[in-house]
Amino acid sequence: MTLHLLRSEGSWADLWSFDLASQGVRLLEIGQHRQFLGASAIERSSRFASTTQAQRFLASRAALWLVLAEYGVGYQELDYGPHGKPSLGISMGFNLSRTGDVAVVAVASADVGVDIEQRRSVDLTEPIVAEVGSTLRRIGWPPRLGHDRLQAWTVMEAWTKYHGLSLHRLLDEREVASRMIDELESRTVQLVSLALSAYICGAMCTGSEAAVGYESGSRLL
């Protein structure tokens, strides 16, 4: 029995981080040995423009299943909701995000969404991005950190993944955008700022009462 199987009470969310530059080869080895890399993942990896990108994708998939195994979840093909959110028909929530050489896996007692992005110059001109940024400043999130549109974008991504919605609906439907703003202002959802390095920003969206824990993927390798 793994340690995480003992967490049966209360609302919680754990975030696991992996450095694909230093751990990617080992993750691929584990993924192949434990048969974590199914036909659908391998097929998707073939669509990437370079071998490096394909290997990072497969390594992040191996990381997902390695983490889920810590919670007693065995490998199986993922099901996908109408807007692309993966599910396994289990009570726990989980989510994966990858940018550059970094991957994070969020596991929670209920729904969870996570997004990380490499800091870079981006042209995010959609009105909802500015509106979310203004809302974040108003509620004082994240504390002690600067606000920018890329950070607001990670919140938008995490929120839509939390709810199993497509980002296009948030961008195109005012009703969905208003719902997000209302949930941020009322603290119906909990936002966790992910400052993994000076070059990466991110956000995790969980239930409002979830106790958040942080884990290094290195201890699973």
Name each region found by the language model.
Residues 1-221:
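Conserved nucleotide-ligand handling architecture
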